[in-house]
């Protein structure tokens, strides 16, 4: 419905990242009519496992997409966290790296609803309003969805929110990583900590009222910190984790 019948092709990559070689392999894999014709590459920044693409990695991907006539879209649901973590200007990991379109996330950073679509390739923006309406994305009170962005982008609020979330995740990582039975699954780079925990420990934490997902393999958990996470809550979770482990 949203993509008008497009097909999603998955590519392998370390730490949740696409690579130029992986993109090229997908383009050249087959060229017959019974195989989807690649047209757009989409990267998630940060990735689904909490790692970030560096400007150098994105420039290499951007060059490969241009080589094969592909568009480059960035899923930036947590884009602010990536910018805060890398300490770079937003342009360095978007249009200067070859990104054509950015989905700039707000709901992960303090806005109640709504994301922003930023076109760097203005040709792609032609009649976008019609396509947004066709996909059911036109709200009758759009001004109420747009207004929070004024406050979010003013005076660097969006980066302060993201930096705080990242800092809370750093604290969480540092408190729980030394605990016996805790295995860190991916490098902590933004506002997420991915850990493997024993099943009884997971259940014990749930029983104490802590909420988190465990959809990553056997015992893999995603622990997220947000713009309003408090340090005392991070320390309380770490203390409960140690108690559940018996450390």
Regions found by a protein language model. Give the residues of each.
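Conserved PLP-enzyme active-site core in the AAT-like
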Residues: 1-208, 214-229, 237-245
């Amino acid at each position: 419905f949203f993509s008008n019948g497009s097909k999603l092709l998955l590519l392998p990559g370390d730490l949740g990242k696409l690579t130029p070689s992986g993109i090229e392999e997908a383009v050249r894999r087959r060229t017959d009519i019974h195989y989807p014709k690649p047209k757009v590459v989409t990267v998630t920044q940060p990735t689904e496992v909490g790692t970030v693409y560096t400007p150098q990695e994105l420039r290499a991907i951007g060059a490969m997409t241009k080589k094969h006539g592909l568009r480059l879209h960035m899923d930036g649901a947590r884009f602010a966290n990536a910018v805060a973590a890398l300490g770079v200007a937003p342009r360095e990991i978007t249009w200067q790296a070859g990104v054509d379109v950015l989905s700039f996330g707000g709901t992960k950073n303090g806005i109640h609803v709504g994301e922003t679509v930023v076109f760097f390739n203005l040709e792609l923006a032609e009649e976008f309003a019609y396509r947004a309406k066709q996909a059911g994305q036109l709200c009758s009170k759009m001004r109420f969805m747009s207004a929070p962005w004024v406050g979010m982008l003013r005076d660097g609020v969006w980066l302060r929110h993201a930096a705080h979330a990242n800092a809370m995740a750093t604290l969480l990582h540092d408190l729980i990583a030394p605990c016996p039975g805790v295995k860190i699954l991916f490098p902590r780079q933004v506002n997420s900590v991915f850990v493997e925990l024993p099943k009884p420990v997971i259940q014990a934490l749930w029983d104490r009222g802590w909420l988190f997902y465990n959809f990553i393999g056997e015992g893999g958990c995603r622990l997220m910190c947000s713009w309003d996470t408090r340090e005392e809550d991070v320390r309380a979770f770490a203390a409960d984790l140690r108690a559940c482990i018996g450390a």
